[in-house]
């Protein structure tokens, strides 16, 4: 089972992925958690580095080979491109664009990178890409803005157990359109 935890940078993917990993591992599951950004950077699994946006253009062929070499069938893929890696389930984490803006600014992201990611959240980019690339029955979307990570993980576990997809209920455009003007 491969679980993709995707969403705009700053939404809480790593926090949720690590907590989900710990919960599944402590329950006896032989599972690994892969932080896509770290793996791509450390192992040169990219086509080029985008200097302006301080990010990598992922080489998906190399990344897929790396994932296959991990040695376990059960994986959590933590990253905003994880929905491109043919997962069994896709968890799309969402958060209030102002919360994302504040988190990214506290990480010293450039103003251009903050703006691009806030726009991506406003326009549902990770959700839309997930729907376009995958079977919609695999997708579960969660608003993480005001939820404790433990509650988010419990919702994910319930989705994995019941397999009832839920997405398309979160929209920030009406309240936060001014952020992209």
Swiss-Prot record:
The name this protein goes by in its record: Putative adenylate kinase
Reaction catalyzed: AMP + ATP = 2 ADP; ATP + H2O = ADP + phosphate + H(+)
Task of the protein: Broad-specificity nucleoside monophosphate (NMP) kinase that catalyzes the reversible transfer of the terminal phosphate group between nucleoside triphosphates and monophosphates. Also has ATPase activity. Involved in the late maturation steps of the 30S ribosomal particles, specifically 16S rRNA maturation. While NMP activity is not required for ribosome maturation, ATPase activity is. Associates transiently with small ribosomal subunit protein uS11. ATP hydrolysis breaks the interaction with uS11.
Keyword Lipoprotein applies: no
Binding-site list for ATP: 10, 12-15, 107, 147
A GO BP annotation: rRNA processing
Organism of provenance: Methanococcus maripaludis (strain C7 / ATCC BAA-1331)
Complexes and interactors: Interacts with uS11. Not a structural component of 40S pre-ribosomes, but transiently interacts with them by binding to uS11.
Region of interest (NMP), ranges: 35-58
Keywords, alphabetical: ATP-binding, Kinase, Nucleotide-binding, Ribosome biogenesis, rRNA processing, Transferase
């Amino acid at each position: 089972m491969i679980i993709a935890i995707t969403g705009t940078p700053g939404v809480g993917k790593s926090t949720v992925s690590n907590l989900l990993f710990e919960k599944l591992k402590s329950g006896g599951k032989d599972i690994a958690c892969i932080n896509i950004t770290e793996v791509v950077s450390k192992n040169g699994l990219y086509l080029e580095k985008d200097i302006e946006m301080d990010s990598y253009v992922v080489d998906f062929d190399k990344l897929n080979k790396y994932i296959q070499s991990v040695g376990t069938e059960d994986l959590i893929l933590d990253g905003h491109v994880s929905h491109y890696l043919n997962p069994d389930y896709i968890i799309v984490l969402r958060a209030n664009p102002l919360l994302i803006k504040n988190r990214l600014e506290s990480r010293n992201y450039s103003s251009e990178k903050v703006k691009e990611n806030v726009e991506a959240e406003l326009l549902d980019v990770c959700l839309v890409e997930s729907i376009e690339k995958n079977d919609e029955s695999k997708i579960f979307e969660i608003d993480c803005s005001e939820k404790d990570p433990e509650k988010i993980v419990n919702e994910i576990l319930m989705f994995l157990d019941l397999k009832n997809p839920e997405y398309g209920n979160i929209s920030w455009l009406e309240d936060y359109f001014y952020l992209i003007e």
